[in-house]
Amino acid sequence: MEHKEVVLLLLLFLKSGQGEPLDDYVNTQGPSLFSVTKKQLGAGSREECAAKCEEDKEFTCRAFQYHSKEQQCVIMAENRKSSIIIRMRDAVLFEK
């Protein structure tokens, strides 16, 4: 194998280990959380919302909801184990 091929394979291997932003979350259609510690942010996609959850410094983000019609992202410190669940038809809940 030539040096270039080895480098290319190594780069592909390293890139594949990063995964997608949503891979760390379990998503459920329908539930919404009643959360005291939360932030409402604008986001153009679920992936962008996941990135905002990961990057938040004010609290440990354990879940987020993305509302595609409004392009609204709600990041929360609680998850279904520590909060009350409310049913919402258009909500998708992502939890760690």
UniProtKB/Swiss-Prot annotation:
Domain of life the protein comes from: Eukaryota
Q: Which residues form the signal peptide?
A: 1-19
Q: Which gene encodes it?
A: PLGLB1
Protein name, entry field? Plasminogen-like protein B
Where in or outside the cell it occurs: the entry states:
Secreted
Purpose of the protein: May bind noncovalently to lysine binding sites present in the kringle structures of plasminogen. This may interfere with the binding of fibrin or alpha-2-antiplasmin to plasminogen and may result in the localization of activity at sites necessary for extracellular matrix destruction.
Q: Recite the UniProt keywords alphabetically.
A: Disulfide bond, Secreted, Signal
Keyword Protease listed: no
Between which residues do disulfide bridges form? C49-C73, C53-C61
Is the keyword Ion transport in the record?
no
What InterPro entries would the database entry show? Pan_app, Plasminogen-rel
